A protein has these predicted regions:
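Asp-based, Mg2+/Mn2+-dependent phosphohydrolase catalytic module
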Residues: 184, 203-236
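Phosphate- and divalent-cation-binding pockets in alpha/beta enzyme and binding domains
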Residues: 23, 48-51, 141, 173, ...
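Conserved acidic, metal-coordinating active-site core of Asp-based
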Residues: 93, 97-203, 212
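Active-site metal-binding loops of divalent metal-dependent hydrolases
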Residues: 9, 44, 193-194
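Non-catalytic pre-domain segments flanking phosphatase-related domains
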Residues: 1-7, 23-26, 179-183
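Active-site phosphate-binding/coordination module
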Residues: 16-113
Length: 236
């Protein structure tokens, strides 16, 4: 059994929005009892991941917000937050152009009001991501603005555009985790399906992909499996 197992959630463990099985939770608890570490690495916020994995929440590491935050046993192991001046600048640009801007905080997402931009404290919590509601509009002006700040696009679909600190990614968080628990690349297994997983998949040759993985991910080389949850349950 690997000392450290790191898995993406959406598209990897969660493919058809089916709840994870009791056998999976039992496996993670057994892995922890043997001194192993399991980390879930996702673009989702910490509070969502904790609810999904509440049965094992005290035994696993949560890497949330595309690597911007890492939590273990309710303690912060690592974070790379959005700088307040950058958050204000991007949110101001978004509001000026008619977009809704949302700040992803540790425990909640909070919409930004224009009057907040003039306040010195702005938000009373760390900002891990800035989420823009696209409403079918072109967001190139916001992407251009981000390039002048310490921000990068970490996720985009037809409805949302998300920014995080340009140095925040899953790979950097996993590196910190490896250092903390003295794990080398041969003792680690990483599972993922999308381009935002490449930074952590590149840290080891022990890579597993679901069948639906993006071609850029498959090109890294690794094992392709039909069901990631079943694969983890059956690990020896």
């Amino acid at each position: 059994m690997y000392r450290l197992i790191v898995s993406d959630y959406d598209g990897t463990l969660n493919v058809n929005d089916k709840p994870l099985s009791q056998n999976f939770f039992t496996k993670l608890n057994m892995h922890a009892c043997r001194g192993g570490i399991f980390a879930i690495a996702s673009g989702r916020p910490y509070n969502q991941l904790k609810k999904i994995l509440f049965q094992v929440s005290q035994n696993i590491v949560f890497i949330s917000d595309d690597g911007a935050q890492m939590m273990y046993k309710n303690c912060v192991l690592y974070k790379k937050t959005v700088d307040i001046p950058d958050a204000k600048a991007l949110c101001s640009k978004a509001l000026d152009n008619g977009f809704t801007a949302i700040c992803a905080l540790r425990e909640e997402n909070r919409s930004v009001k224009r009057e907040q931009l003039s306040l010195p404290f702005f938000m009373n919590s760390d900002i891990f991501k800035i989420i823009i509601v696209k409403d079918g509009e072109n967001t190139d002006i916001l992407k251009a603005a981000a390039q002048t700040l310490n921000l990068r696009v970490c996720y985009e679909d037809k409805d949302y555009l998300e920014f995080c600190h340009k140095e925040a990614n899953k790979g950097e968080a996993v590196k910190k985790l490896m250092q903390k628990f003295s794990v080398n690349e041969n003792q680690m297994l990483v599972l993922g399906d999308n381009v935002n997983d490449i930074s952590m998949l590149s840290l080891t040759k022990n890579r597993v992909f679901p069948q639906n993985a993006r071609q850029e991910v498959l090109d890294l080389g690794g094992t392709v499996v039909e069901n990631v949850e079943k694969y983890i349950i059956e690990l020896k």
